[in-house]
Amino acid sequence: MAYTIIVHLLAKNDASCIQKLKDKLVEASQVYSKDPETLSWFVMQDFEEPRRFAIVERYVGEESQKYHLENPYWQTFDPYVLPLLEEPMDLRRLGELEGSVM
């Protein structure tokens, strides 16, 4: 059963903040996708509200998240991203249901 984290982010209502957040999320996806035991690390932007973004992180198991947290890049992520946000990140931790199909 994969361990999944879904994060919703809302950028400040400023074109520069939106673009900076978008660029940082794409960069983060390229970095974190290479971490051991990371199944996928997707970033998405809302079609109707371009200030809204989502991250879907999938790991082999909950303990696999340690590789993500030990990645030196992680230390740069929050300090860069948090000032670009209108509100705190909404982070949810989930376990994929057995028998579900991708």
Features from the language model and the residues they span:
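Eukaryotic N-terminal low-complexity, Ser/Thr- and Lys/Arg-rich leader segments
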Residues: 1-3, 101-102
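N-terminal first-folded block
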Residues: 2-35, 39, 43
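Short, well-ordered beta-strand segments in beta-rich or mixed alpha/beta enzyme
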Residues: 3-10, 42-69
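Glycine-rich beta-strand-turn "strand-cap" elements at beta-sheet edges
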Residues: 10, 43-51, 79-102
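Short phosphate-engaging motifs
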Residues: 17, 51, 73
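An amphipathic, aromatic/His-enriched active-site/gating alpha helix that lines ligand/cofactor pockets
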Residues: 27, 31-39, 58-92
